Regions:
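Acidic/glycine-rich phosphate/pyrophosphate-binding loops and surrounding catalytic core
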Residues: 132-140, 145, 177-207
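Pocket-edge structural micro-motifs
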Residues: 134, 156, 175, 180, ...
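OB-fold single-stranded nucleic acid-binding module
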Residues: 57-61, 163, 181-189
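Short Pro-Gly-centered flexible turn/kink motifs
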Residues: 163-182
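Short acidic, Pro/Gly- and aromatic-enriched capping/linker segments at domain boundaries
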Residues: 146-166
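A residue-level signal for beta-strand positions that form part of recognition/binding surfaces
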Residues: 129, 170, 213-215
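An acidic-aromatic substrate-binding cleft motif
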Residues: 186-240
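Polysaccharide-binding surfaces and accessory modules of carbohydrate-active proteins
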Residues: 1-144, 159
């Protein structure tokens, strides 16, 4: 079902699946961004029945394989998450070994804590690629595997999900965004993704990008030997 979109240059569809036996309803809301060759979707599960739903677990919001015309190596470009160190958000690149799954997930229940940020770039041997983003503030996972020298697979969703829904209860999954790019330089894909985020994922007020305050704190006891009590002065706090 095509539905009206409130956003400019965005098309929107709603796909609905319903099981009359147990009353489980699944809705997939899809957004398309034609100017950026991007698609985004999220799943919603609703129990329309009169008793608890069957168990929902291991839901893969994306479970996809793509085959390219050229043979060769696939490269994964991603960034470190937050370790409270000078290496936070450091860019990383790995060549995917055929048949070995690269598993990515954050730590501590936070979407960007640990070794990975929730978006990454897959570069194919064909001078094409896809950037995948996971929209989730909790613990997500993403598995990427070079099935052979032409095929790449990816799966992603909520890492820990085993639950049931009470009658009339609803839950949503992480959202998934795929943006496709084509260029011999994979940085063209990164820059296209930045433009996509600015155009469609950045808050604007009266047509202008929102300006947020710079802020800092001492909750991680640094720089050593400082803590929030031993070094902080009024002037220092104002400067921070």
């Amino acid at each position: 079902q095509k539905i009206e979109s409130e956003e400019a240059d965005v098309i929107k569809y709603l796909f609905t699946y319903y099981n009359p036996t147990n009353g489980l309803k699944v809705e997939c809301t899809v957004k398309g961004y034609p100017s950026y060759q991007a698609a985004e979707w999220v799943l919603n599960f609703t129990n329309k029945g009169t008793s608890n739903s069957p168990t929902l677990e291991q839901v893969k919001v994306v479970d996809l394989a793509m085959q390219y015309a050229s043979k060769g190596e696939f490269k994964l470009h991603y960034a470190d998450g937050n370790h409270i160190s000078k290496y936070d958000f450091h860019p990383r690149s790995v060549t995917l070994a055929t048949g070995e799954t690269k598993q990515m997930s954050p730590q501590g229940g936070r979407s960007s804590e640990g070794d990975y940020l929730p978006f990454f770039n897959i570069e194919s041997p064909a001078g094409q690629g896809v950037i995948l983003g996971v929209g989730w503030s909790g613990t997500w996972y993403a598995d990427v595997c070079a099935q052979d020298n032409r095929t790449i697979s990816m799966a992603s969703g909520m890492k820990t999900m085993k639950l049931y829904l009470r009658p009339q209860e609803t839950i949503r999954t992480p959202s998934i965004s795929l943006m496709f790019w084509e260029n011999i330089d994979r940085m063209a894909g990164h820059n296209k993704f930045r433009r996509f985020v600015l155009a469609h994922k950045s808050r604007k007020i009266n047509g202008k990008f929102a300006e947020y305050p710079l802020s800092s704190g001492f909750n991680y006891r640094d720089p050593a030997p400082c803590t929030e009590y031993s070094c902080l002065t009024a002037d220092y706090a104002i400067a921070m």
